[in-house]
């Protein structure tokens, strides 16, 4: 029978308890940097865009099968009454998410090619990516 000694884990935990500090960085003392913040938002925008695509596919299926239904017309009429500001806000943020996700993906392709991997260039490409996402969003919003 194999015997494993886990006493070293207990000793390390006791030492950390004696000096009254957490074993790993806690969220209250951890400062967010642009690199991990942009990575988190890249994942969030990808999820939002995927869910939006699923929602629109579901709506198209409803249109295809239930176009003559009274319930569908009543829902469309109700949504039409409240569609002003809400529709504009949702469409603006979806456009921003599309451009943000596009430029973040291009940034990752540049990294995959082996360029801009120094920390200064990582920060610079992050700021450039943010600026391009907002700029292209505003340009597309003005044009369309």
From Swiss-Prot:
The keyword Zinc does not apply. The heme is bound between the two transmembrane subunits. Its cofactor is heme. One of its GO terms (cellular component) is mitochondrial inner membrane. PROSITE patterns: SDH_CYT_1 (PS01000), SDH_CYT_2 (PS01001). The chain crosses the membrane at residues 40-60, 84-104, 124-144. GO terms for biological process: mitochondrial electron transport, succinate to ubiquinone; tricarboxylic acid cycle. Pathway: Carbohydrate metabolism; tricarboxylic acid cycle. Keywords: Electron transport, Heme, Iron, Membrane, Metal-binding, Mitochondrion, Mitochondrion inner membrane, Transmembrane, Transmembrane helix, Transport, Tricarboxylic acid cycle. It is found in: Mitochondrion inner membrane. Heme binds at residue 101. Pfam families: Sdh_cyt (PF01127). GO terms for molecular function: electron transfer activity; metal ion binding. It is a multi-pass membrane protein. Membrane-anchoring subunit of succinate dehydrogenase (SDH) that is involved in complex II of the mitochondrial electron transport chain and is responsible for transferring electrons from succinate to ubiquinone (coenzyme Q). Belongs to the cytochrome b560 family. Forms part of complex II containing four subunits: a 70 kDa flavoprotein (FP), a 27 kDa iron-sulfur protein (IP), a cytochrome B and a membrane-anchoring protein. This is Succinate dehydrogenase cytochrome b560 subunit.
